[in-house]
UniProtKB/Swiss-Prot annotation:
Residue(s) carrying N-acetylmethionine: M1
Gene3D superfamilies, alphabetized: 3.10.50.40, Tetratricopeptide repeat domain
Residue ranges, annotated region (Calmodulin-binding): 529-545
Pfam families referenced in this protein's UniProt entry, alphabetically: FKBP_C, TPR_1
Record lineage: Eukaryota, Viridiplantae, Streptophyta, Embryophyta, Tracheophyta
Induction entry: By wounding, NaCl and by heat shock.
Organism: Arabidopsis thaliana (Mouse-ear cress)
Molecular function per GO: calmodulin binding; peptidyl-prolyl cis-trans isomerase activity
Role of this protein: PPIases accelerate the folding of proteins. It catalyzes the cis-trans isomerization of proline imidic peptide bonds in oligopeptides. Co-chaperone that positively modulates thermotolerance by interacting with HSP90.1 and increasing the HSFA2-mediated accumulation of chaperones of the small-HSPs family.
EC number: 5.2.1.8
TPR repeats, residue ranges: 400-433, 449-482, 483-516
Tissue expression profile of the protein: Expressed at low levels in roots, stems, leaves and flowers. Detected in the vascular elements of roots, in hydathodes and trichomes of leaves and in stigma, sepals, and anthers.
InterPro entries xref list: FKBP4/5/8-like, PPIase_dom_sf, PPIase_FKBP_dom, TPR-like_helical_dom_sf, TPR_rpt
Residue ranges constituting the PPIase FKBP-type domain according to the UniProt record: 57-145, 173-262, 290-383
Name assigned to this protein: Peptidyl-prolyl cis-trans isomerase FKBP62
Amino acid sequence: MDANFEMPPVGGMNDDDDMDFGDGASFLKVGEEKEIQQGLKKKLLKEGEGYETPENGDEVEVHYTGTLLDGTKFDSSRDRATPFKFTLGQGQVIKGWDIGIKTMKKGENAVFTIPAELAYGESGSPPTIPANATLQFDVELLKWDSVKDICKDGGVFKKILAVGEKWENPKDLDEVLVKFEAKLEDGTVVGKSDGVEFTVKDGHFCPALTKAVKTMKKGEKVLLTVKPQYGFGEKGKPASAGEGAVPPNATLEINLELVSWKTVSEVTDDNKVVKKVLKEGDGYERPNEGAVVKVKLIGKLQDGTVFLKKGHGENEEPFEFKTDEEQVVDGLDRAVMKMKKGEVALVTIDPEYAFGSNESQQELAVVPPNSTVTYEVDLLTFDKERESWDMNTEEKIEAASKKKEEGNSKFKGGKYSLASKRYEKAVKFIEYDTSFSEEEKKQAKALKVACNLNDAACKLKLKDYKQAEKLCTKVLELESTNVKALYRRAQAYMELSDLDLAEFDVKKALEIDPNNREVKLEQKRLKEKMKEFNKKEAKFYGNMFAKLSKE
Protein backbone atom coordinates (compact mmCIF):
# COMPACT_ATOMS: atom_id res chain seq x y z
CA MET A 1 0.00 0.00 0.00
CA ASP A 2 1.16 3.52 -0.54
CA ALA A 3 2.32 5.88 2.15
CA ASN A 4 -0.99 7.69 2.50
CA PHE A 5 -3.28 4.64 2.67
CA GLU A 6 -3.15 1.83 5.20
CA MET A 7 -4.88 -1.51 5.09
CA PRO A 8 -5.13 -2.27 8.82
CA PRO A 9 -6.62 -5.51 10.08
CA VAL A 10 -10.13 -5.51 11.45
CA GLY A 11 -10.43 -7.64 14.56
CA GLY A 12 -6.95 -9.19 14.35
CA MET A 13 -6.60 -12.82 13.31
CA ASN A 14 -9.56 -14.37 11.53
CA ASP A 15 -11.97 -16.65 13.36
CA ASP A 16 -12.31 -18.53 10.07
CA ASP A 17 -8.60 -19.28 9.57
CA ASP A 18 -9.07 -23.06 9.67
CA MET A 19 -12.17 -23.14 7.50
CA ASP A 20 -12.23 -24.04 3.81
CA PHE A 21 -14.12 -21.70 1.49
CA GLY A 22 -12.69 -23.07 -1.73
CA ASP A 23 -15.25 -25.63 -2.92
CA GLY A 24 -17.67 -23.25 -4.59
CA ALA A 25 -15.63 -20.09 -4.99
CA SER A 26 -12.64 -21.88 -6.57
CA PHE A 27 -14.73 -23.39 -9.39
CA LEU A 28 -16.63 -20.42 -10.74
CA LYS A 29 -17.06 -19.87 -14.45
CA VAL A 30 -15.77 -16.65 -15.98
CA GLY A 31 -18.40 -13.94 -15.43
CA GLU A 32 -20.13 -15.89 -12.64
CA GLU A 33 -20.57 -14.37 -9.18
CA LYS A 34 -21.12 -16.28 -5.94
CA GLU A 35 -21.34 -15.44 -2.26
CA ILE A 36 -18.49 -17.00 -0.27
CA GLN A 37 -19.73 -16.13 3.22
CA GLN A 38 -21.21 -13.31 5.32
CA GLY A 39 -22.08 -11.22 2.27
CA LEU A 40 -18.61 -11.54 0.73
CA LYS A 41 -19.07 -12.08 -3.02
CA LYS A 42 -16.60 -13.19 -5.66
CA LYS A 43 -16.95 -12.63 -9.42
CA LEU A 44 -14.46 -14.46 -11.65
CA LEU A 45 -12.90 -12.34 -14.42
CA LYS A 46 -10.07 -14.65 -15.50
CA GLU A 47 -9.33 -18.28 -14.65
CA GLY A 48 -6.10 -19.17 -12.88
CA GLU A 49 -3.66 -22.02 -13.36
CA GLY A 50 -4.00 -25.51 -11.87
CA TYR A 51 -5.94 -26.33 -8.72
CA GLU A 52 -3.71 -25.12 -5.87
CA THR A 53 -4.68 -22.14 -3.73
CA PRO A 54 -2.61 -20.33 -1.07
CA GLU A 55 -2.81 -21.22 2.61
CA ASN A 56 -2.44 -19.26 5.84
CA GLY A 57 1.20 -18.33 6.36
CA ASP A 58 1.95 -18.05 2.64
CA GLU A 59 3.31 -14.73 1.38
CA VAL A 60 1.04 -13.72 -1.49
CA GLU A 61 1.69 -11.13 -4.17
CA VAL A 62 -1.25 -9.40 -5.85
CA HIS A 63 -2.23 -6.48 -8.02
CA TYR A 64 -5.45 -4.77 -6.98
CA THR A 65 -7.70 -1.77 -7.49
CA GLY A 66 -10.03 -0.73 -4.66
CA THR A 67 -13.23 1.25 -5.25
CA LEU A 68 -16.32 2.32 -3.38
CA LEU A 69 -19.66 1.09 -4.76
CA ASP A 70 -20.13 4.41 -6.61
CA GLY A 71 -16.92 3.73 -8.53
CA THR A 72 -14.69 6.10 -6.57
CA LYS A 73 -11.16 4.65 -6.65
CA PHE A 74 -9.30 4.96 -3.34
CA ASP A 75 -6.21 2.85 -3.95
CA SER A 76 -4.47 0.82 -6.67
CA SER A 77 -1.21 -1.12 -6.79
CA ARG A 78 -1.57 -1.09 -10.59
CA ASP A 79 -1.33 2.71 -10.62
CA ARG A 80 1.95 2.42 -8.72
CA ALA A 81 3.14 -0.45 -10.97
CA THR A 82 4.21 -2.25 -7.78
CA PRO A 83 2.54 -5.48 -6.62
CA PHE A 84 1.30 -5.65 -3.01
CA LYS A 85 2.67 -8.40 -0.75
CA PHE A 86 1.30 -9.68 2.53
CA THR A 87 1.18 -12.84 4.61
CA LEU A 88 -2.16 -14.61 4.31
CA GLY A 89 -4.20 -15.28 7.41
CA GLN A 90 -2.11 -13.10 9.72
CA GLY A 91 -4.54 -10.19 9.99
CA GLN A 92 -2.30 -7.89 7.93
CA VAL A 93 -5.23 -6.98 5.68
CA ILE A 94 -8.99 -6.68 6.05
CA LYS A 95 -10.82 -9.90 6.83
CA GLY A 96 -12.54 -10.05 3.43
CA TRP A 97 -9.14 -10.26 1.74
CA ASP A 98 -7.86 -13.03 4.02
CA ILE A 99 -10.98 -15.08 3.27
CA GLY A 100 -11.33 -14.30 -0.44
CA ILE A 101 -7.75 -14.67 -1.62
CA LYS A 102 -7.56 -18.20 -0.16
CA THR A 103 -10.06 -19.18 -2.90
CA MET A 104 -7.84 -17.97 -5.77
CA LYS A 105 -5.43 -19.81 -8.05
CA LYS A 106 -2.18 -18.45 -9.47
CA GLY A 107 -2.88 -15.94 -12.25
CA GLU A 108 -6.59 -15.70 -11.39
CA ASN A 109 -8.36 -12.32 -11.61
CA ALA A 110 -11.54 -11.73 -9.63
CA VAL A 111 -13.67 -8.93 -8.18
CA PHE A 112 -14.55 -9.21 -4.50
CA THR A 113 -17.48 -7.26 -3.09
CA ILE A 114 -16.73 -6.94 0.62
CA PRO A 115 -19.34 -5.83 3.16
CA ALA A 116 -18.34 -3.34 5.85
CA GLU A 117 -18.17 -5.96 8.61
CA LEU A 118 -15.41 -7.76 6.67
CA ALA A 119 -13.72 -4.47 5.72
CA TYR A 120 -13.39 -1.34 7.87
CA GLY A 121 -16.71 -1.52 9.72
CA GLU A 122 -18.27 1.43 11.48
CA SER A 123 -15.03 3.43 11.73
CA GLY A 124 -14.09 3.33 8.03
CA SER A 125 -10.55 4.35 7.07
CA PRO A 126 -10.57 8.15 6.77
CA PRO A 127 -10.11 10.09 4.66
CA THR A 128 -10.54 7.59 1.82
CA ILE A 129 -13.16 5.13 3.07
CA PRO A 130 -16.39 6.21 4.80
CA ALA A 131 -17.96 4.41 7.74
CA ASN A 132 -20.02 1.27 6.97
CA ALA A 133 -18.76 1.20 3.38
CA THR A 134 -19.12 -1.86 1.13
CA LEU A 135 -15.96 -2.09 -0.98
CA GLN A 136 -15.00 -3.68 -4.29
CA PHE A 137 -11.50 -4.96 -5.04
CA ASP A 138 -10.36 -6.09 -8.48
CA VAL A 139 -7.60 -8.54 -7.48
CA GLU A 140 -5.11 -10.54 -9.56
CA LEU A 141 -3.18 -13.22 -7.66
CA LEU A 142 0.31 -13.11 -9.17
CA LYS A 143 2.04 -15.73 -7.00
CA TRP A 144 2.72 -16.91 -3.47
CA ASP A 145 5.82 -18.18 -1.72
CA SER A 146 6.77 -19.92 1.50
CA VAL A 147 7.91 -17.43 4.16
CA LYS A 148 10.44 -19.88 5.69
CA ASP A 149 13.27 -19.04 3.28
CA ILE A 150 13.28 -15.36 4.20
CA CYS A 151 15.94 -14.23 1.69
CA LYS A 152 14.63 -16.51 -1.09
CA ASP A 153 18.15 -17.78 -1.77
CA GLY A 154 18.62 -20.39 0.95
CA GLY A 155 20.80 -18.00 2.96
CA VAL A 156 18.56 -17.61 6.02
CA PHE A 157 15.91 -20.11 7.12
CA LYS A 158 13.48 -19.09 9.85
CA LYS A 159 11.62 -21.42 12.19
CA ILE A 160 9.06 -19.76 14.47
CA LEU A 161 9.34 -20.91 18.08
CA ALA A 162 6.82 -18.46 19.58
CA VAL A 163 4.25 -16.50 17.60
CA GLY A 164 4.38 -12.73 18.00
CA GLU A 165 1.66 -10.16 18.62
CA LYS A 166 -0.41 -8.14 16.14
CA TRP A 167 0.61 -7.94 12.48
CA GLU A 168 3.21 -5.18 12.08
CA ASN A 169 6.86 -5.76 11.22
CA PRO A 170 9.78 -3.37 11.81
CA LYS A 171 10.95 -1.23 8.88
CA ASP A 172 14.44 -0.01 7.95
CA LEU A 173 14.30 3.17 10.03
CA ASP A 174 12.82 1.56 13.15
CA GLU A 175 14.80 1.05 16.37
CA VAL A 176 14.44 -2.57 17.53
CA LEU A 177 15.19 -4.19 20.88
CA VAL A 178 16.24 -7.85 20.57
CA LYS A 179 17.65 -10.72 22.58
CA PHE A 180 19.80 -13.28 20.77
CA GLU A 181 22.25 -16.13 21.17
CA ALA A 182 24.38 -17.26 18.23
CA LYS A 183 26.11 -20.65 18.10
CA LEU A 184 28.22 -22.64 15.71
CA GLU A 185 26.86 -25.99 14.57
CA ASP A 186 28.92 -27.66 17.35
CA GLY A 187 27.17 -25.55 20.01
CA THR A 188 29.97 -23.03 20.63
CA VAL A 189 28.47 -19.66 21.63
CA VAL A 190 29.87 -16.91 19.38
CA GLY A 191 27.52 -14.04 20.22
CA LYS A 192 24.92 -13.22 22.86
CA SER A 193 22.86 -10.32 24.24
CA ASP A 194 20.06 -10.13 26.79
CA GLY A 195 18.89 -6.87 25.23
CA VAL A 196 20.46 -4.74 22.52
CA GLU A 197 18.86 -1.86 20.61
CA PHE A 198 19.77 -0.94 17.04
CA THR A 199 18.35 0.71 13.94
CA VAL A 200 17.22 -1.99 11.51
CA LYS A 201 19.00 -0.58 8.46
CA ASP A 202 22.27 -0.20 10.43
CA GLY A 203 22.14 -3.80 11.63
CA HIS A 204 23.90 -5.62 14.46
CA PHE A 205 26.17 -8.66 14.87
CA CYS A 206 25.64 -10.10 11.37
CA PRO A 207 23.47 -9.29 8.30
CA ALA A 208 21.01 -12.09 9.11
CA LEU A 209 19.61 -10.18 12.12
CA THR A 210 18.46 -7.29 9.95
CA LYS A 211 16.91 -9.68 7.42
CA ALA A 212 15.12 -11.64 10.14
CA VAL A 213 13.72 -8.83 12.31
CA LYS A 214 12.01 -7.28 9.27
CA THR A 215 9.90 -10.46 9.01
CA MET A 216 9.09 -10.70 12.74
CA LYS A 217 6.31 -9.45 14.98
CA LYS A 218 6.58 -8.05 18.49
CA GLY A 219 7.38 -10.86 20.96
CA GLU A 220 8.16 -13.39 18.21
CA LYS A 221 10.91 -15.93 18.91
CA VAL A 222 12.67 -17.74 16.08
CA LEU A 223 15.51 -20.08 15.29
CA LEU A 224 17.61 -18.91 12.33
CA THR A 225 19.89 -21.12 10.28
CA VAL A 226 22.35 -18.69 8.72
CA LYS A 227 24.66 -19.48 5.81
CA PRO A 228 28.07 -17.70 5.63
CA GLN A 229 26.93 -14.99 3.20
CA TYR A 230 24.55 -13.65 5.89
CA GLY A 231 26.93 -14.43 8.76
CA PHE A 232 30.65 -13.62 8.70
CA GLY A 233 31.55 -14.94 5.26
CA GLU A 234 35.04 -16.02 4.24
CA LYS A 235 36.79 -13.92 6.92
CA GLY A 236 34.96 -15.20 9.98
CA LYS A 237 35.15 -13.35 13.33
CA PRO A 238 37.86 -13.43 16.01
CA ALA A 239 37.05 -14.52 19.56
CA SER A 240 36.05 -11.88 22.10
CA ALA A 241 35.29 -11.81 25.84
CA GLY A 242 33.18 -14.86 26.63
CA GLU A 243 32.44 -15.55 22.96
CA GLY A 244 34.11 -18.01 20.64
CA ALA A 245 35.58 -17.23 17.24
CA VAL A 246 33.57 -17.72 14.06
CA PRO A 247 35.66 -19.74 11.56
CA PRO A 248 35.64 -18.80 7.87
CA ASN A 249 32.56 -19.96 5.92
CA ALA A 250 30.75 -21.07 9.09
CA THR A 251 27.02 -21.72 9.32
CA LEU A 252 25.37 -20.19 12.40
CA GLU A 253 22.30 -21.05 14.44
CA ILE A 254 20.75 -17.99 16.11
CA ASN A 255 17.96 -17.93 18.67
CA LEU A 256 16.39 -14.50 18.24
CA GLU A 257 13.59 -12.69 20.10
CA LEU A 258 12.12 -9.40 18.92
CA VAL A 259 11.25 -7.78 22.26
CA SER A 260 9.86 -4.49 20.92
CA TRP A 261 10.59 -1.60 18.61
CA LYS A 262 10.08 2.13 18.19
CA THR A 263 8.53 3.02 14.85
CA VAL A 264 10.54 5.62 12.94
CA SER A 265 9.00 7.10 9.80
CA GLU A 266 9.83 9.75 7.23
CA VAL A 267 7.21 12.48 7.42
CA THR A 268 8.58 14.13 4.26
CA ASP A 269 9.89 12.40 1.14
CA ASP A 270 13.29 14.10 1.48
CA ASN A 271 13.86 12.59 4.97
CA LYS A 272 14.15 16.05 6.53
CA VAL A 273 11.30 15.49 8.98
CA VAL A 274 11.48 12.18 10.88
CA LYS A 275 9.06 10.90 13.53
CA LYS A 276 9.96 8.30 16.17
CA VAL A 277 7.04 6.84 18.13
CA LEU A 278 7.79 6.75 21.87
CA LYS A 279 4.30 5.61 22.84
CA GLU A 280 1.72 4.09 20.50
CA GLY A 281 -1.56 5.93 20.01
CA ASP A 282 -5.10 4.60 19.78
CA GLY A 283 -7.02 3.50 16.68
CA TYR A 284 -6.22 4.53 13.11
CA GLU A 285 -7.60 8.05 12.79
CA ARG A 286 -5.24 11.00 12.42
CA PRO A 287 -5.81 14.76 12.21
CA ASN A 288 -6.54 16.03 8.73
CA GLU A 289 -5.80 19.44 7.22
CA GLY A 290 -7.81 22.00 9.15
CA ALA A 291 -8.13 19.86 12.30
CA VAL A 292 -7.96 21.51 15.72
CA VAL A 293 -5.38 19.66 17.83
CA LYS A 294 -4.40 19.81 21.50
CA VAL A 295 -0.85 18.77 22.38
CA LYS A 296 1.89 18.88 24.96
CA LEU A 297 5.17 20.11 23.46
CA ILE A 298 8.84 20.32 24.34
CA GLY A 299 11.09 21.88 21.69
CA LYS A 300 14.87 21.40 21.90
CA LEU A 301 18.02 22.30 20.01
CA GLN A 302 20.55 19.58 19.15
CA ASP A 303 22.60 20.48 22.26
CA GLY A 304 19.58 19.86 24.50
CA THR A 305 18.63 23.52 25.05
CA VAL A 306 14.86 23.76 25.60
CA PHE A 307 13.42 26.65 23.58
CA LEU A 308 9.71 25.86 23.94
CA LYS A 309 7.57 24.09 26.52
CA LYS A 310 3.77 23.99 26.28
CA GLY A 311 1.13 22.16 28.31
CA HIS A 312 3.53 20.66 30.87
CA GLY A 313 3.11 23.13 33.74
CA GLU A 314 0.83 22.50 36.69
CA ASN A 315 -2.73 23.51 35.73
CA GLU A 316 -1.41 24.63 32.32
CA GLU A 317 -3.82 24.13 29.43
CA PRO A 318 -2.65 22.02 26.46
CA PHE A 319 -1.29 23.91 23.46
CA GLU A 320 -3.99 24.20 20.79
CA PHE A 321 -3.51 24.95 17.10
CA LYS A 322 -5.15 24.37 13.74
CA THR A 323 -3.25 22.24 11.26
CA ASP A 324 -2.20 23.57 7.85
CA GLU A 325 -2.57 27.19 8.98
CA GLU A 326 1.13 28.03 9.61
CA GLN A 327 0.47 28.32 13.35
CA VAL A 328 3.53 26.13 14.06
CA VAL A 329 6.64 25.31 12.02
CA ASP A 330 5.93 23.30 8.88
CA GLY A 331 7.69 20.11 10.00
CA LEU A 332 5.74 19.96 13.27
CA ASP A 333 2.49 20.64 11.40
CA ARG A 334 3.14 17.73 9.02
CA ALA A 335 4.25 15.37 11.79
CA VAL A 336 1.16 15.94 13.97
CA MET A 337 -1.05 15.01 11.00
CA LYS A 338 0.72 11.60 10.99
CA MET A 339 -0.03 10.92 14.68
CA LYS A 340 -2.83 9.08 16.46
CA LYS A 341 -4.69 10.19 19.57
CA GLY A 342 -2.61 9.42 22.67
CA GLU A 343 0.59 8.96 20.67
CA VAL A 344 3.84 10.41 22.00
CA ALA A 345 6.52 11.01 19.36
CA LEU A 346 9.95 12.56 18.98
CA VAL A 347 10.04 14.65 15.80
CA THR A 348 13.41 15.68 14.31
CA ILE A 349 13.15 18.59 11.87
CA ASP A 350 15.80 20.00 9.52
CA PRO A 351 16.06 23.82 9.26
CA GLU A 352 14.17 23.88 5.95
CA TYR A 353 11.01 22.72 7.74
CA ALA A 354 11.72 24.55 11.02
CA PHE A 355 13.05 28.12 11.38
CA GLY A 356 15.19 28.24 8.24
CA SER A 357 18.21 30.50 7.91
CA ASN A 358 16.87 33.15 10.30
CA GLU A 359 17.39 33.48 14.03
CA SER A 360 14.12 32.99 15.92
CA GLN A 361 13.35 34.17 19.45
CA GLN A 362 11.21 31.48 21.05
CA GLU A 363 9.54 31.28 24.46
CA LEU A 364 12.56 30.01 26.45
CA ALA A 365 15.57 30.47 24.18
CA VAL A 366 16.81 31.74 20.83
CA VAL A 367 16.90 29.27 17.93
CA PRO A 368 20.06 30.08 15.92
CA PRO A 369 19.99 30.20 12.10
CA ASN A 370 20.03 26.85 10.25
CA SER A 371 19.19 24.83 13.37
CA THR A 372 17.93 21.26 13.35
CA VAL A 373 15.36 21.00 16.14
CA THR A 374 13.43 18.26 17.92
CA TYR A 375 9.96 18.28 19.42
CA GLU A 376 8.59 15.77 21.88
CA VAL A 377 4.88 15.79 21.06
CA ASP A 378 2.02 14.25 23.03
CA LEU A 379 -1.16 14.36 20.93
CA LEU A 380 -3.95 14.57 23.50
CA THR A 381 -7.05 15.16 21.35
CA PHE A 382 -8.09 16.44 17.94
CA ASP A 383 -11.26 17.47 16.13
CA LYS A 384 -11.09 16.71 12.43
CA GLU A 385 -12.40 19.01 9.75
CA ARG A 386 -15.56 17.49 8.28
CA GLU A 387 -15.19 15.24 5.26
CA SER A 388 -17.42 15.45 2.20
CA TRP A 389 -19.24 12.19 2.96
CA ASP A 390 -20.48 13.70 6.22
CA MET A 391 -22.23 16.52 4.33
CA ASN A 392 -25.39 16.90 2.29
CA THR A 393 -25.19 18.53 -1.14
CA GLU A 394 -25.92 22.03 0.15
CA GLU A 395 -23.19 21.71 2.78
CA LYS A 396 -20.70 20.47 0.18
CA ILE A 397 -21.25 23.56 -1.97
CA GLU A 398 -21.02 25.81 1.08
CA ALA A 399 -17.78 24.12 2.19
CA ALA A 400 -16.31 24.43 -1.31
CA SER A 401 -17.17 28.14 -1.42
CA LYS A 402 -15.53 28.66 1.97
CA LYS A 403 -12.35 26.87 0.88
CA LYS A 404 -12.26 28.97 -2.29
CA GLU A 405 -12.41 32.19 -0.25
CA GLU A 406 -9.67 30.87 2.05
CA GLY A 407 -7.59 30.14 -1.05
CA ASN A 408 -8.15 33.65 -2.39
CA SER A 409 -6.98 35.11 0.93
CA LYS A 410 -3.84 32.94 0.96
CA PHE A 411 -3.10 33.86 -2.67
CA LYS A 412 -3.35 37.59 -1.96
CA GLY A 413 -0.91 37.08 0.91
CA GLY A 414 1.57 35.39 -1.42
CA LYS A 415 1.13 31.97 0.20
CA TYR A 416 0.69 30.11 -3.06
CA SER A 417 1.26 26.58 -1.78
CA LEU A 418 -1.36 26.98 0.96
CA ALA A 419 -3.73 28.64 -1.49
CA SER A 420 -3.34 25.73 -3.90
CA LYS A 421 -4.28 23.26 -1.14
CA ARG A 422 -7.44 25.23 -0.39
CA TYR A 423 -8.54 25.24 -4.04
CA GLU A 424 -7.85 21.51 -4.34
CA LYS A 425 -9.88 20.80 -1.19
CA ALA A 426 -12.73 22.93 -2.53
CA VAL A 427 -12.88 20.88 -5.74
CA LYS A 428 -12.84 17.60 -3.79
CA PHE A 429 -15.99 18.62 -1.89
CA ILE A 430 -17.94 18.89 -5.17
CA GLU A 431 -16.03 16.46 -7.40
CA TYR A 432 -18.84 13.90 -7.50
CA ASP A 433 -22.09 15.73 -8.25
CA THR A 434 -24.43 12.95 -9.39
CA SER A 435 -26.72 13.55 -6.39
CA PHE A 436 -26.85 17.33 -6.95
CA SER A 437 -29.93 19.13 -8.25
CA GLU A 438 -29.65 20.98 -11.57
CA GLU A 439 -29.16 24.29 -9.78
CA GLU A 440 -26.53 22.76 -7.50
CA LYS A 441 -24.73 21.30 -10.52
CA LYS A 442 -24.52 24.80 -12.02
CA GLN A 443 -23.09 26.16 -8.78
CA ALA A 444 -20.65 23.26 -8.55
CA LYS A 445 -19.49 23.79 -12.13
CA ALA A 446 -18.86 27.48 -11.52
CA LEU A 447 -16.87 26.65 -8.39
CA LYS A 448 -14.83 23.98 -10.20
CA VAL A 449 -13.98 26.43 -12.97
CA ALA A 450 -12.99 29.21 -10.55
CA CYS A 451 -10.98 26.97 -8.22
CA ASN A 452 -9.10 25.15 -10.98
CA LEU A 453 -8.29 28.47 -12.66
CA ASN A 454 -7.04 29.96 -9.41
CA ASP A 455 -5.11 26.79 -8.63
CA ALA A 456 -3.48 27.02 -12.06
CA ALA A 457 -2.38 30.56 -11.18
CA CYS A 458 -0.83 29.16 -7.97
CA LYS A 459 0.99 26.44 -9.90
CA LEU A 460 2.40 29.03 -12.32
CA LYS A 461 3.72 31.02 -9.35
CA LEU A 462 5.20 27.81 -7.91
CA LYS A 463 6.74 26.95 -11.31
CA ASP A 464 4.76 23.70 -11.50
CA TYR A 465 3.94 24.26 -15.15
CA LYS A 466 2.83 20.72 -15.98
CA GLN A 467 0.18 20.79 -13.25
CA ALA A 468 -0.89 24.28 -14.31
CA GLU A 469 -1.46 22.97 -17.84
CA LYS A 470 -3.54 20.04 -16.53
CA LEU A 471 -5.74 22.31 -14.38
CA CYS A 472 -6.42 24.65 -17.31
CA THR A 473 -7.31 21.65 -19.47
CA LYS A 474 -9.87 20.58 -16.83
CA VAL A 475 -11.45 24.03 -17.04
CA LEU A 476 -11.57 23.89 -20.84
CA GLU A 477 -13.31 20.52 -20.66
CA LEU A 478 -16.09 22.34 -18.80
CA GLU A 479 -15.92 25.64 -20.71
CA SER A 480 -14.14 25.35 -24.06
CA THR A 481 -14.15 29.13 -24.63
CA ASN A 482 -12.75 30.18 -21.26
CA VAL A 483 -10.18 32.85 -22.16
CA LYS A 484 -8.40 32.79 -18.79
CA ALA A 485 -7.86 29.04 -19.08
CA LEU A 486 -6.45 29.40 -22.60
CA TYR A 487 -4.23 32.29 -21.46
CA ARG A 488 -2.83 30.46 -18.43
CA ARG A 489 -2.37 27.22 -20.35
CA ALA A 490 -0.44 29.15 -22.99
CA GLN A 491 1.80 30.52 -20.22
CA ALA A 492 2.41 26.97 -18.98
CA TYR A 493 3.11 25.68 -22.50
CA MET A 494 5.65 28.47 -23.05
CA GLU A 495 7.54 27.57 -19.89
CA LEU A 496 7.47 23.92 -20.98
CA SER A 497 8.82 25.00 -24.42
CA ASP A 498 5.70 23.72 -26.19
CA LEU A 499 5.59 26.87 -28.31
CA ASP A 500 3.27 25.53 -31.02
CA LEU A 501 0.65 24.58 -28.43
CA ALA A 502 1.07 27.96 -26.74
CA GLU A 503 0.53 29.71 -30.08
CA PHE A 504 -2.66 27.70 -30.70
CA ASP A 505 -4.12 28.71 -27.32
CA VAL A 506 -3.17 32.38 -27.76
CA LYS A 507 -4.79 32.51 -31.22
CA LYS A 508 -7.96 30.85 -29.95
CA ALA A 509 -8.15 33.23 -26.97
CA LEU A 510 -7.86 36.26 -29.27
CA GLU A 511 -10.54 34.87 -31.58
CA ILE A 512 -12.88 34.81 -28.58
CA ASP A 513 -11.72 38.14 -27.08
CA PRO A 514 -9.74 40.15 -29.68
CA ASN A 515 -9.16 43.12 -27.34
CA ASN A 516 -7.86 41.20 -24.33
CA ARG A 517 -4.77 43.13 -23.23
CA GLU A 518 -3.17 40.32 -21.21
CA VAL A 519 -3.46 37.84 -24.06
CA LYS A 520 -1.99 40.37 -26.51
CA LEU A 521 1.01 40.87 -24.23
CA GLU A 522 1.41 37.11 -24.02
CA GLN A 523 1.26 36.91 -27.83
CA LYS A 524 4.07 39.47 -28.03
CA ARG A 525 6.16 37.51 -25.51
CA LEU A 526 5.48 34.30 -27.43
CA LYS A 527 6.63 35.84 -30.74
CA GLU A 528 9.87 36.98 -29.10
CA LYS A 529 10.43 33.53 -27.63
CA MET A 530 9.74 31.84 -31.00
CA LYS A 531 12.13 34.25 -32.71
CA GLU A 532 14.82 33.44 -30.15
CA PHE A 533 14.15 29.71 -30.55
CA ASN A 534 14.41 29.94 -34.36
CA LYS A 535 17.74 31.76 -34.07
CA LYS A 536 19.15 29.06 -31.80
CA GLU A 537 17.86 26.35 -34.12
CA ALA A 538 19.38 28.04 -37.19
CA LYS A 539 22.72 28.37 -35.40
CA PHE A 540 22.64 24.72 -34.36
CA TYR A 541 21.95 23.45 -37.88
CA GLY A 542 24.46 25.92 -39.33
CA ASN A 543 27.20 24.56 -37.10
CA MET A 544 26.19 21.00 -37.89
CA PHE A 545 26.32 21.55 -41.68
CA ALA A 546 29.64 23.38 -41.33
CA LYS A 547 31.14 20.36 -39.58
CA LEU A 548 29.74 18.02 -42.24
CA SER A 549 31.18 20.11 -45.09
CA LYS A 550 34.65 20.07 -43.46
CA GLU A 551 34.51 16.30 -43.28
